[in-house]
Amino acid sequence: MDRREHFYRKAVSHWIEINAKVLVVAGGSADYLVFKSLDFTNVTITNIDPRINKNDYYPFSYKFQDAENLTYENDSFDFVVVHAALHHCSSPHKALTEMYRVAEKGILVIESRDSFIMKLLVKLGYVVNYELRAVFDNKCLYGGVNDSEIPNFVYRWTENEVEKTINTFMPIGMHQFFYMYANDKDFNKLNISKLHKIILYFFKVIYRAFIFFFPRQQNLFSILVLKPDLSKQLHPWLKFYNGSIRLKKTYLVKKFE
């Protein structure tokens, strides 16, 4: 496993119980290896790649599913997981809310963080905004946006953006958000000149000290969103009435009159 996959494994083992019913969207071999290494048994891996052989994911289940338009009913799985794939969607926010919809307990996302350091590396030309290499490595036929031949824009997230997206999609309860951070960049493998590699080598010490004090400036983070227990975490201006959630008018009257 590489650095990113080790971080992925750490996040799964830390946040998801081994007997959970898990759906992985836009999944692949890395997801299979992580969940298999952790001895999970109830996992469904999905993707839209026509080349995938479902037998390669045994003993897990494999289904053809679009992350932006899942066919599952609400709350079909305990947790829904995505690893390094939301940025391949034409609408990452739609995929995120679809994950939320079909999860009963919560969602786990491992993606690139839109940090100051990453923005600086993009401007300096050390990190790309479009994934041309992914398409090249897939014979210029797959690996881009929606797994097409068109290279995707690398959509990077922030904590605030995740929280705004979830709270906008489901504004009825108090969600819980948890984060872990890591760095998966090996600057020695960057396609840059030897001089630039030497310069970056000396900056490594400074960078390590910097992220010690500012861990959120690393390029990678995992996001756990736990759905609210509406019997306890419903917003105070709402109430249950005849099996549905309604506005508690008395709350607004008391607040504004």
Question: Where are each of the predicted segments found?
Answer:
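A conserved beta-strand element that flanks and buttresses the S-adenosyl-L-methionine
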Residues: 81
